[in-house]
């Protein structure tokens, strides 16, 4: 009750709040029915509990292109909530739902924008995910690539252009670091360290991660190496989806070959209960781990 009332307070445009209890499957099926009746339901779940309702997302909401928005609290690593509560599966799972769009905001302003944008979509499901606790500090973009809102990719760092070395930048393709959602700060920290060492590097953050934006594919194909950092399952996650999209572009008559893609994320195993910081360090997903992976990629792509 407290959870649903707080949601109602945050979204005064809501007509009503329905607490279905611990019945995620029913919540999704009921929301599809509400959408068919002309409403736009918002379903609030812990990310890990969406797993048990995947069939309803796929067959009741996705198949019928119902305008339902799902907001996933505690997405990514939750640490001391316990091994069962890590919301690490959603991006890999939901990418298989045709027509579904998923946003992974990196800060509070992005979260608010993503929710507003999701509510404008009435012919497909939308998902907005955010981590446990406070979102990272505001991270303004230098510029935006792609079409807003769903194809927009924010450029957070562009070392060659920022330094005024346009000619050098054009002669040397950059490393591209992609920070998905709450992992954008780690990607940006690694990018700044590489830039300080003289590397040409871009750090970007897609506002909507599923499907992979065309602008992100273009940026990746123009890089000499790509590193994707995400707080979800690495197998089938955003890095895997980007790599597949790049390969499809090559096979469709694009560039002769695609640059290498390194994926940093949660490995395919159950994680022991620990603090979020300890798990990030264990999985080499903290800032030092991301920087080490970026340096290995830079050496490989010299």
Predicted regions and their residues:
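Thiamine diphosphate
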Residues: 25, 50, 63-86, 91, ...
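Conserved glycine-bearing catalytic or ligand-binding loops at nucleotide- and phosphate-handling centers
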Residues: 104-121
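A short, small-residue-rich loop immediately preceding and capping a beta-strand
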Residues: 16-19, 37-48, 68-71
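Structural motif
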Residues: 20-21, 44-45, 105, 178, ...
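Glycine-rich anion/phosphate-binding loops
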Residues: 49-55
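Short, small-residue-biased leader/transition segments that mark boundaries at the very start
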Residues: 2-11
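Alpha-helix C-terminal capping segments
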Residues: 12, 30-40, 60-65, 96, ...
């Amino acid at each position: 009750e407290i959870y649903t009332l707080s949601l109602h307070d945050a979204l005064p445009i809501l007509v009503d709040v329905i607490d279905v209890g611990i019945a995620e499957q029913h919540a999704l099926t009921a929301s599809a029915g509400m959408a068919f009746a002309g409403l736009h339901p918002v379903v609030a779940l812990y990310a890990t509990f969406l797993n048990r309702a995947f069939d309803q997302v796929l067959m009741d909401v996705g198949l019928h292109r119902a305008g339902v928005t799902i907001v996933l609290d505690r997405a990514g690593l939750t640490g001391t909530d316990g091994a069962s509560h890590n919301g690490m599966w959603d991006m890999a799972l939901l990418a298989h739902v045709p027509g579904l769009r998923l946003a992974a905001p990196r800060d509070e302003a992005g979260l608010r924008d993503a929710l507003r944008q999701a509510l404008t979509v009435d012919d497909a499901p939308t998902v907005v995910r955010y981590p446990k606790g406070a979102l990272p500090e505001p991270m303004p973009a230098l510029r935006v690539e792609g079409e807003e809102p769903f194809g927009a990719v924010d450029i957070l760092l562009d070392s060659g252009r920022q330094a005024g070395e346009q000619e050098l930048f054009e002669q040397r393709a950059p490393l591209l670091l992609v920070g998905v959602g709450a992992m954008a700060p780690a990607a940006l920290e690694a990018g700044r360290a590489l830039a300080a060492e003289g590397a040409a590097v871009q750090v970007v953050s897609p506002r909507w991660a599923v499907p992979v934006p065309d602008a992100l594919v273009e940026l990746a194909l123009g890089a000499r190496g790509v590193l994707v950092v995400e707080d979800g399952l690495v197998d089938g996650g955003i890095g895997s989806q980007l790599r597949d999209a790049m390969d499809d572009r090559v096979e469709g008559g694009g560039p002769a070959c695609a640059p290498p893609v390194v994926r940093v994320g949660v490995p395919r195993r159950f994680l022991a209960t620990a603090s979020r910081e300890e798990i990030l360090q264990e999985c080499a997903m903290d800032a030092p781990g991301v920087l080490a992976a970026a340096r290995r990629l830079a050496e490989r792509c010299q």
